Amino acid sequence: MSLSSLLFYFVIIVPSAIIHEYAHGWMAERLGDPTARYAGRLTLDPRSHIDLWGTIVMPLFLFVVSGGSFMFAYAKPVPYNPYNLKNQKWGPAAVAVAGPLSNFLLAACFAALIRLMPVFPPSIWQLAPLFSIIVFANLLLMIFNLVPIPPLDGSKILFAILPDSMYKLRATLQQYLSLIHI
């Protein structure tokens, strides 16, 4: 992968990650928690979501170490207070689902544009490969975030589904799997 390819993927992944994080804050606010707004994070402004390590340093490091074959980036997680949510059991799951759902919707919109390409003038058709990469990147982000390992969104969905009697298991999984993530 060349430096231009790195920048190309970076320009696709970072906005998708920002929209993903914004969706978490948006859903939390809809469910009664204004924390993201108070923290200045209920915005699509990239400056509010860029994490020095996860958005800049780590992707560049991985790109260099892998010889240009691998890159991974993430945006700062949007804060929310689950105790402010109207529904304490399902609220955190709804906030968690909002991020991957935003990636799915982005992928669906760009897939629809690809499908509609024949309607547009041939000069527009050259955007199809770009749109395909956007679809692929967003589906990849969605699937990755649905993995049920803390702190990923899938774990919050799983924890909402687990019965309350499994609270100790949930707490243990959160504690130890979050350490593995770090």
Where are these regions (language model features)?
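Hydrophobic transmembrane alpha-helices and their immediate loop junctions
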Residues: 1-180
